[in-house]
Structures are given as C-alpha cells and as structure tokens.
C-alpha cells in the first residue's frame, strides 16, 4: 500500500492512498462470499446463488462494503503510523472500485495544531480593584423585604404608584372599533412589572379607585399580532381596586426569619456583606483570568481546527440552554435558534479553543499536573458546592473515568493559569478605568 501525506495547512492534512489490486480483489471476494451466505433470490437456495446474479443484485452494496472496509483499515493504520492527531472525521474522496485494479482514495482531516507556546511570563494585565459598595447590601435587604411583603388595601383616595397592584377593567379600540383580545375584567397588574404595552402602566400612575380614563398607546413594531403591530390604540380603563405592598420592618425579628444564626439584623447585614464581597472577588478573578488568556493569545496566534470550534460552540449552546431552563426561559424566548446562537458566539468559541490549547501547551512545557491530594481537595469543594455527601461525590469521580479525566483536565488548566498569573505584571486599577 502506498501512502503520501500533504499539508493543506498547519491544521489540515491530506492522506493519499493506493491499495494494491490483489488486496482489492481479496476484499471483493470476501464481500461476495459473505453476501452469498445470506442472499435470497427466487429459485435458489441460500448459499447457492450464482456469482453472476449476486453481482447483478448486490454489486452496489458489495462495493460500499469493500470501500468501507478498505478505508477503515488503511486510514486508521496510516494515522497511527504517521503520528497524526486527528480532530473529527475525515472527508473521503475516491475513485470507483474495480476488481483487478488498485483502489485510490484521499482522506482530508483536521489535526490538532502543534503549539509552540512562547512569551507566557511577564504578561501585562490589569486587575479591577476591589471596592465594596454598601448600597448593594441595602438593595439586597430591600429585595428580601419585597419578597416577604404582603398585599393590603390602599388607603382611601390613594393614587396608584409603581409597585402597587391594581385591579381594573379595560377595553381596547383601534379607530373606534374594539378589537379581539383587547378587553378584560378584574385584571390585576403590578405597576412597573412591564407586562403591558410600553407606556400603558406609566399612564395608570396617579389614578384612584373609581377612575375611568382613556390610555393611548402604540403597539410595538415587533408585536406578536401582526394586525396590531406598530399601530395606535385607545384603552378605556376603569380602576376597581388598588393594593399596596406592606413591607416588614427591618429589625431583629426580620433577620431571624432567615435562619437561627441571624439573631440580630446586624448579623444578617454582615452575612450579606460577606456574600457580596465573595461574589465580587469571584467576578474580578474571572475577568482577570479572561484578560490573562486574551493576552496569552495575542502573544501566540495560532490556527485552530473548525471541528474543535464546532464542538466548543455546541458545548456553549448546551450550557446556555440549561442555564435558561433553570430560569424558566428558552432560546426561543430570547428570539434565537440553536444555529443563530452558535453563529453569534462562534468567535467566542474560537477564542476559548485557542486559550485551552495554549494553556495545555504551557502545562506540558512546565510539567504542570494536579496531584492526587489536590484532586481529593477538589472533590471536597464540589461536595460542598453541590451540597452532596463527600463519599457519594468521591465514588462518582472514581468510578467514572471520563468524569475524572475532565475534572483533572480542568484542574490542570487552572494550575497553568495560576502559573502564568504568578509571573504576570498585574496592575490594580479602579473599575471605571478598565476598558
């Protein structure tokens, strides 16, 4: 068998094969013999069908089987012998199969790039300075108050305000004609929730129980009903009831509602401040990591296989869909499809692939590997984060080789990032100064 390898570019190879005629003939005979065992042709017993009839009825299938066998055997053998590291499946081009003649075909496949990483020490990056905003804790307490609030009747003469719950009747008309789906009775709406057409809720502010008024709005251009989209409408509104939120007082009793450990409001505030600081530190470090990897990529431009980019884009898509599902949302609700998402974030996927390849090269060059002790410690972190029993988590990762390999690969990458960060020139600056 003759094999030659062409470099289409740094990440794509073309393997050309010529398989000898005697090998082709042997495979053809073997394929016919196998088909003959099971061939069912009227007038002949299985295994006794003449070869001429088998060729007539099964010649096309035979050719497919032979080509498949020849390609599989020769391609994987050549990949191993040539020391190639393919990404994905090859694109096969071949001549027609003819018994008694050699079989020629080519296999074009993307391969992992040979990464010669450089200039990964002394990278200049900026890090956001940690600045604690006390208003965040106040805002969080306000959210907690809102969550524990109860609705009570508004005082007599109360003018509706944002945040109030208003019960009302409405009828919508266009050019004086009421339209289908534009009316309701005893409809309840929280002003400021954004559930109605833009401008509708704002015009209800200031109304009192018993008010009868007309609200003028324009349906958005992209409104779901094409008959209404972009058109003006008048809504007759009759206010029947207004309820206001009654917020619990911020005191020690309020704090105790969130756990026995919060005996005082100050303890609750301290915990919220601690959580906010931890979140800010995590965000700042994640953004620093992104800048560090971006700086590494700028020093080491490289081509990456499209198959790896496809794979990363698919992983990003699945992760996003899971996150949206946890929030009872979907891509469709965001106005996107699987394909449009992957197209929009393809460049991000490409940069992530570049970063992973470069970090892997740094780890290889610096002999960076997570230790067994670090692996055990990470299992404890996972157990704590997922609120699972440590023994259960340990069993999962020690019996699932793929899960363990993925975790070890992530830990290796994290250690490579830390190695580069320890040797980087990091400048802390206020958030406002970061571009």
Curated annotation (Swiss-Prot):
Belongs to the FKBP-type PPIase family. Tig subfamily. The gene is tig. This is Trigger factor. One of its GO terms (molecular function) is ribosome binding. One of its GO terms (cellular component) is cytoplasm. The keyword Transmembrane does not apply. Keywords: Cell cycle, Cell division, Chaperone, Cytoplasm, Isomerase, Rotamase. NCBIfam families: tig (TIGR00115).
């Amino acid at each position: 068998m003759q094999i030659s390898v062409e470099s289409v570019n740094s990440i794509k190879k073309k393997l050309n094969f010529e398989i000898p005629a005697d090998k082709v003939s042997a495979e053809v005979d073997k394929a016919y013999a196998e088909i003959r065992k099971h061939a069912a042709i009227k007038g002949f017993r299985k295994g006794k069908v003449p070869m001429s009839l088998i060729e007539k009825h099964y010649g096309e299938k035979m050719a497919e089987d032979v080509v498949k066998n020849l390609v599989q055997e020769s391609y994987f053998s050549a990949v191993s012998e040539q020391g190639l590291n393919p990404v994905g499946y090859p694109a096969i081009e071949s001549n027609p199969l003819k018994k008694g003649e050699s079989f020629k075909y080519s296999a074009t496949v993307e391969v992992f790039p040979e990464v010669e990483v450089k200039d990964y020490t002394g990278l200049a990056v900026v890090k956001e300075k940690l600045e604690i905003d006390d208003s965040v804790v106040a805002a969080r307490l306000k959210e907690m108050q809102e969550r524990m609030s109860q609705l009570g009747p508004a005082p007599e003469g109360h003018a509706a305000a944002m945040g109030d719950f208003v019960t009302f009747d409405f009828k919508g008309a266009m050019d004086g004609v009421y339209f289908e789906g534009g009316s309701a009775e005893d409809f309840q709406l929280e002003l400021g929730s954004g559930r109605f057409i833009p401008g509708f809720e704002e015009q209800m502010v200031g109304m009192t129980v018993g008010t009868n008024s007309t609200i003028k709005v324009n349906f958005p251009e992209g409104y779901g009903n094409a008959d209404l989209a972009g058109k003006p409408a008048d809504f007759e509104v009759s206010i029947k009831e207004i309820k206001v939120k009654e917020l619990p007082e911020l005191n020690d009793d309020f704090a105790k509602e969130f756990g026995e450990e919060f005996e005082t409001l100050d303890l609750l505030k301290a915990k919220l401040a601690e959580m906010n600081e931890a979140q800010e530190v995590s965000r700042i470090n994640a953004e620093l990591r992104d800048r560090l990897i971006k700086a590494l990529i700028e020093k080491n431009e490289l081509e990456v296989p499209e198959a790896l980019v496809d794979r990363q884009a698919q992983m990003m898509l699945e992760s996003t869909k899971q996150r949206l599902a946890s929030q009872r949302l979907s891509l469709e609700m965001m106005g996107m499809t699987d394909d449009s998402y992957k197209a929009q974030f393809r460049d991000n996927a490409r940069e992530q692939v570049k970063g992973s390849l470069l970090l892997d090269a740094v780890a290889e060059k610096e002999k960076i590997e997570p230790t067994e002790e670090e692996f055990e410690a990470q299992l404890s972190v996972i157990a704590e984060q997922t609120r699972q029993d440590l023994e259960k988590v340990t069993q999962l990762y020690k019996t699932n080789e793929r899960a363990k390999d993925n975790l070890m690969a992530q830990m290796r990458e994290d250690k490579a990032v830390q190695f580069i960060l320890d040797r980087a020139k990091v400048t802390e600056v206020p958030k406002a100064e970061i571009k």
